[in-house]
Curated annotation (Swiss-Prot):
A Gene Ontology BP annotation from the UniProt entry: double-strand break repair via homologous recombination
Positions of ATP binding: G8, R9, S10, G11, S12, G13, K14, T15
UniProt entry keywords in alphabetical sequence: 4Fe-4S, ATP-binding, DNA damage, DNA repair, DNA-binding, Exonuclease, Helicase, Hydrolase, Iron, Iron-sulfur, Metal-binding, Nuclease, Nucleotide-binding
Organism: Bacillus pumilus (strain SAFR-032)
Quaternary structure note: Heterodimer of AddA and AddB.
Species lineage: Bacteria, Bacillati, Bacillota, Bacilli, Bacillales
Protein name in UniProt: ATP-dependent helicase/deoxyribonuclease subunit B
């Protein structure tokens, strides 16, 4: 038995000495006794590479690099100690999930916390800690019982927590018993098997890279001391600690304590002990400033280094993004200008996760190959999401969200279909399911999905060929999804035991060819050079299969409910991690200060050197709090270090990082976080500035304009990055600011490079004004043809904003349809219901004015019942909530029909047309226009209601439009082309009255009828008839009426003097109109309708001439942008030059009419000329 201690500060050559010694032994005797190099997990690949890259290693037949875990696996395989089933942390977490559910009633503390996310993982880590520190369930129980009666509340609380941990620990051990081995028991078994391991006898063991050992690891080392020929152990310490432990505040407290522990163990074993002290700093022979920093770190008082300090750079950055971009630029400069290889450079953070996403994004932008050390979670891999979402589909009764989470993993796509085509078809199915509210048995009842692009409440249209083709495609895609998931659901429903449930999931994965699809994805990633991604695809299937195997091995014959099975599977999947090794040798290594191990690093960037980050504040994420640990320590239980001890050890981790690079050390910190909150630099920055006052300083910025030309040149990283910065600089130049000549050189290069078309296209953004140019004539013709057929509302849309019209009617863009009841649906229902009631009355030869209240109830309910199944894919029949809405809509319709009946009783007008169509198959012809540019335009549509009345002067016609919100007619909106419907309908019916009704007619007015169920507020209680009277007033129709007393009295035959309760008109005692009456002369109606015609003609010409301007109006506080669906496309922004509203002025009706008359006269004169 022999042990040699190698002691020395960082950079003194301990690891190099071990490697050289191993290489020498291999050279002298390639087939001699085994050489085992024992290092931490993070260091195995690095040391294997260092040994393998030398020719003297002879292929490493004799020497092997192991971590403790890999050594255990190797020895147990040789000695037969691996005959029991090993359970990984993933399997333990699944087991603990089951145990927690079973033992929840026994908990004193964990009852509420046990259902929180991450709880199982914390418990598993605590169990692992008990194992590593050789704590048995009996010991935990003993401490808990003894402290349960303590007079101190804190101790009793801690004892209750320990009670719950003992329950879980005991139950876990009972489940494992003699058949299984906890992964943390590897080292205990290893210690037991070392005496019979031939590989250890005569072997030379080298131990390096460890800062401390757990009791389990010390048990293994003890057996190695007893049975190996020699052990050599290297520690980063400033002196030998063979006879004393270091002071608590000593920089080398952690490693010195470990040195002392191992030395005492070696003495107890009776080993021959020798020590070699490495005193010279070999790493920094040519960088005396870094050597001084290494030697003087944490020495008090500070002795400043007065010499030049070219190898230490402290960089300040405005943000984390600016910091990482600055690091990327410096890395490229080191490679291009200083001749370093990427493998010579490392980036280190205290917590890599804080920077991981930014590092990935920036380094990919800058084309810097990198490897991030650490085990990344598998939870975002598509296979993990497939399993989770498929179980959620079953749990949630085939809800849309779960189904399409499953679909978007792309594992349900057939192998023979290209991914792009499959994605497009899956997206179309998703849109269909959202629009039709597909869920539950609609997926599984065997019926086909039916597709109709347009659906009317009044008529049934034949399904078009395009709709038939779309329907077939949707059902084909459905067949990718439903059969495998439905089979999984049936198998899980019939499963009796865990074994059957796991088998159901496995068969599901096999049926959809997951292994083949993963292999295909792996090969595609390899071919594209995405090696890390390829490795992930290779590992994830094995990890899932291992998880299933462990589940079956441990609990295969037990019966579980589906919810608990899903919880356990979910827990297991959440714990899976990728074990990646660097896919390439020449790449930047990115790691954390505490876990990563590096060797022969020339340049190191320590990022995120901010207050609270370096040194790190101890996190209290464990089940056991700091107080709990202190209490356990007093009770004689040895566990992992307390927060106070970890805080003391932070200085050693910082020291290790500072002393790692041989050529150059970069420290950087951010001045603000992502939200703009200010951040302070770490005390380490101030300390280094005091110790090394002549250090180099740098500023990492996102805008290079403040830097010297040579510094700005670093921003020219590659074409992609350079283009971005060039555009930014040229924008400054356009704003009359000077820029460096560097950017003109870059610009000239970009304009002549092979990718110049891309650069030119992006450069065009410099002259972006957010103005839409008119369409070319050939494009306009392709979009619209020579003949436009449209609606009045389409023309109103164009007059509101030409670009919005272009987006909806030119590009035919549409909002995604959702399965929900919206205002247009309700409006459509009311229109159709009122038509249905009117048609029924005609069939039954009844009149509105003869209806009783009971009739209104009957007809309204019947109309809603008939139309509800046809509205928005049967949405009113889909749920109890919508059934309630249907009842509310019936109530409103009953109220409205009752009011219409009351109106009819006092009116001389009666309906002559309901939902009256013009154009197409309608009884009225379309409005047609011959445009100046040779195109033609016709307007088609439907009129809600046309009423007629016989007067002494002939036939009167009026238009009534049903509205779900209160509406009046603003002549300013008519003038600007924003409200054209009612006057168009009136013009149309009057123009074609003879062809339609066989007699010329006179316009009587245009009125809006508000469909609603008003709520009456009164200062005093009202009688029922008074309430009805107030409600009746709320239905007064607004609009414009003919300035004719006879016509007005025909609308309200009760009107003699005073104000009408039916229309917006009133009469004085002398029979003339009151001033607040909304009346116009027949000439004025004619002037308005002629203006509307001219407005249509002008709009048609502008559309066919290709006008697509982004020109929304603003009238008072109204703008079309408020409810526009295309804001993200036009990107209208008042802060951009030339993006201004067309401000329209609102004027009194008589002023508007006078203006229209004047313009009409000018138009007539122009036509005459």
């Amino acid at each position: 038995m022999e042990i040699q201690f190698l002691a020395g500060r960082s950079g003194s050559g301990k690891t190099t000495a071990i490697l050289e010694e191993i290489k020498e032994q291999l050279r002298l005797d390639p087939l001699g006794p085994p050489i085992i190099f024992l290092v931490p997990d993070q260091m195995t690949f690095l040391m294997e590479y260092e040994l393998a890259k030398t020719s003297e290693a002879g292929g490493m037949i004799r020497a092997k690099v192991f971590s403790f875990t890999r050594l255990a696996w190797s020895i147990l395989q040789q000695t037969g100690g691996a005959n029991r089933q090993f359970v990984t942390s993933t399997g333990i977490q699944m087991l603990l999930r089951k145990v927690i559910e079973e033992q929840k009633d026994k908990f004193k503390v964990f009852k509420k916390a046990s259902d929180k996310p991450g709880f199982v993982e914390q418990i598993e880590k605590t169990m692992a800690e008990f194992k590593r520190y050789c704590m048995l369930p009996e010991e935990i129980e003993k401490i808990s019982v003894e402290s349960m009666l303590s007079e101190y509340t804190e101790e009793r609380r801690a004892a209750e927590k320990l009670h719950d941990l003992h329950v879980l620990y005991q139950q876990m051990e009972e489940h494992l018993q003699d058949e299984y081995v906890h992964s943390e028991d590897y080292l205990n078994l290893l210690a037991q098997q070392i005496p019979s391991a031939e590989e250890i006898k005569g072997a030379h063991i080298y131990i390096d890279g460890f800062y401390q050992f757990t009791p389990q690891q010390l048990l293994v080392i003890e057996q190695l001391l007893l049975h190996a020929a020699k052990v050599t152990a290297a520690f980063t310490v400033d002196q030998s600690y063979h006879d004393r432990q270091p002071n608590e505040l000593d920089l080398f407290r952690m490693t010195g304590k470990t040195y002392f522990q191992l030395y005492q163990l070696a003495k107890e074993c009776g080993a021959d002990i020798s020590e070699t002290i490495f005193e010279r700093n070999h790493r920094h022979l040519y960088t005396p400033d870094l050597a001084y920093l290494e030697h003087q770190y944490e020495q008090r008082p500070v002795q400043p280094y007065q010499e030049n300090t070219p190898h230490l750079t402290v960089s300040k950055s405005a943000s984390k993004r600016a910091e990482i971009e600055g690091v990327a630029r410096d890395i490229l400069d080191l490679v291009r200008e200083k001749g370093l290889r990427l493998r010579d450079i490392s980036v280190v953070a205290r917590h890599v996760d804080d920077y991981k996403d930014t590092l990935k994004e920036v380094f990919r932008d800058y084309d810097i190959p990198f490897f991030i050390d650490g085990n990344e979670s598998m939870q975002y891999h598509p296979l993990i999401e497939l399993i989770r979402s498929s179980l959620d589909v079953i749990k949630g009764n085939w809800r849309y969200e779960a189904v399409f989470r499953c679909v978007k993993t792309e594992f349900l796509f057939p192998l023979e279909i290209t991914k792009n085509k499959a994605r497009e078809q899956a997206d179309q199915l998703e849109n269909y399911c959202i629009a039709y509210g597909v869920k539950g048995e609609r997926w599984t009842n065997g019926s086909r999905f039916h597709y109709r692009r347009f659906q009317s409440l009044d008529e049934d249209f034949r399904q078009t060929d395009q709709e038939i083709e779309m329907e077939q495609m949707l059902n084909d895609v459905k067949e990718w999804i439903t059969p495998p998931l439905y089979q999984l659901q049936k198998r899980l429903k019939n499963a009796q035991k865990v074994r059957d449930m796991v088998e159901a999931v496995y068969v599901f994965l096999e049926e959809i060819q997951v292994p083949d699809k993963l292999e295909k994805a792996r090969l595609e990633a390899e071919e594209a050079g995405r090696l890390a991604e390829a490795m992930q695809h290779g590992q994830v299937w094995d990890a899932v299969i291992q998880l299933m195997d462990e589940f079956v091995d441990m609990l295969g014959d037990e019966e579980l409910s589906f919810p608990l099975f899903q919880q356990m599977i979910d827990t297991g999947l959440a714990s899976l991690k990728f074990a990646l090794i660097p896919p390439s040798l020449d790449q930047v290594f990115i790691g954390s200060m505490d876990l990563s191990r590096m060797y022969q690093v020339k340049c190191m960037f320590i990022i995120g050197v901010n207050d609270g980050v370096i040194p790190a504040r101890p996190s209290d994420e464990s089940v056991l709090s700091e107080d709990d640990r202190e209490w356990l320590k007093r009770a004689g239980a040895e566990l992992a270090e307390t927060g106070k001890e970890r805080l003391l050890d932070e200085q050693f981790l910082i020291y290790q990082a500072l002393s790692s690079p041989s050529h150059h050390l970069y420290l950087s910190y951010a001045a603000s976080d992502a939200e703009g909150r200010s951040l302070l630099p770490s005390p380490l920055i101030k300390y280094c500035q005091e110790l090394m006052p002549n250090h180099q300083q740098a500023l990492y910025v996102l805008d290079p304009e403040l830097l010297e030309d040579d510094e700005q040149l670093k921003f020219v990283a590659n074409e992609h990055v350079s283009l971005s910065y060039t555009i930014s600089q040229l924008q400054q130049w356009l704003n009359q600011y000077p820029i460096s000549g560097v950017w003109w050189s870059v610009y000239n290069y970009l304009m002549t490079s092979p990718n110049r078309d891309v650069s030119k296209n992006i450069m065009s953004s410099l002259f972006f004004t957010n103005r839409a140019k008119p369409l070319k004539p050939n494009v306009t013709k392709e979009l619209y043809g020579d003949h436009i057929q449209g609606s009045v509302s389409r023309m109103e849309k164009f007059n509101a904003c030409a670009f919005s019209h272009f987006a909806s009617h030119g590009l035919k863009l549409k909002d995604r349809q959702f399965y929900k009841l919206e205002a247009p649906d309700i409006g459509q229902l009311f229109h159709s219901a009122l038509k249905h009631i009117s048609d029924t009355l005609v069939e039954q030869k009844k009149d509105w004015k003869n209806l009783t209240k009971e009739d209104c109830v009957t007809y309204s309910r019947h109309a809603i019942e008939q139309l509800a199944p046809r509205l928005q894919k049967e949405i009113l029949l889909s749920s109890n909530r919508h059934a309630y809405i249907k009842e509310k809509l019936q109530k409103i319709l009953i109220r409205v029909s009752s009011i219409l009946s009351e109106h009819a009783k006092v009116s001389g007008f009666s309906p002559v047309g309901l939902e009256l169509g013009f154009g197409g198959q309608g009884p009225l012809p379309p409005f047609t226009f011959q445009l100046k540019n040779g195109c033609t335009m016709e307007l088609v549509g439907r009129i809600d209601r046309v009423d007629k009345a016989e007067g002494s002067k002939g036939l009167f016609l009026r238009i009534v439009d049903y509205k779900s919100s209160e509406k009046g007619l603003d002549l300013a909106e008519v003038y600007y082309g924003l409200a054209l419907q009612m006057l168009t309908y009136l013009d149309l019916t009057i123009t074609y009255s003879k062809e339609w009704l066989g007699i010329e007619a006179t316009p009587a007015g245009i009125l809006y009828f508000h469909i609603h169920d008003p709520f009456i507020q009164a200062p005093i209680p009202l009688a029922e008839d008074e309430i009805e009277q107030e409600i009746f007033k709320k239905f007064k129709m607004k609009g414009l009426l003919l300035e004719d007393v006879e016509a007005v009295k025909l609308m309200d035959q009760t009107l003699e003097s005073g104000r009408s309760q039916v229309i917006q008109a009133g009469l004085k005692k002398d029979g003339s109109f009151r001033s607040d009456s909304a009346v116009l002369s027949e000439d004025h109606f004619h002037i308005l309708t002629q203006h509307v015609r001219r407005t249509f003609e002008e709009a048609g010409e502008r559309i066919t001439n290709g006008e697509v301007a982004i020109n929304p109006y603003k009238l008072k506080d109204q703008t079309p942008c408020r409810f526009c669906s295309f804001k993200s496309i036009c990107q209208f922004d008042e802060s951009i030059e030339d993006n201004d509203f067309r401000v329209l002025t609102s004027e009194k009706d008589d002023v508007v009419i006078e203006r229209i008359k004047k313009e009409g006269d000018q138009y007539a004169n122009t036509k005459t000329e």
